Amino acid sequence: MSDRLTIEQRHNNMAAIRGKDTKPEILVRKFLWARGFRYRLNHPRLPGKPDIVLRKYRTCILVNGCFWHGHEGCKYYVVPKSNTQFWQDKIRRNRERDHEVLHRLAEMGWHTIVIWECELKPAVREKTLESLAFTLNHIFLEDHHIRRYELPEAKPAMVAEPEPRHRD
């Protein structure tokens, strides 16, 4: 089946697809802000410029589109019928780059959370976002747990001086 759009129309359509401020990303950002989580966007010093960076939690959140990042088993990831080899190569390169970015962030000591576009569809959105908040709180508590200090067993010290013995 051939493309219904002209080459020029398809070019304009594809050029309009943005990589930042996507609807799924904005949903996650609004949820985080409403819950009191403060973050930075597309941090330039981190590998891959993660979508959302929470420094306090040492966590990066990547909001991935199912098509562009090749979400296996997802109904939104379907390779187009035209120019198939190009799309397979492009999505494979995206997945390899994603894997490399996750590996480099882990080496730097950063936690990473990947949220897929399909996990933000209305039927499962609330569950996904609540799970995100739970995960962030868990990460914070694990990284900042209270350390107990064990003291060696010793003879208890005396609080008061011994009474002097008087002679009668």
Regions found by a protein language model. Give the residues of each.
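Nucleic-acid endo/exonuclease domains
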Residues: 1-114, 118-168
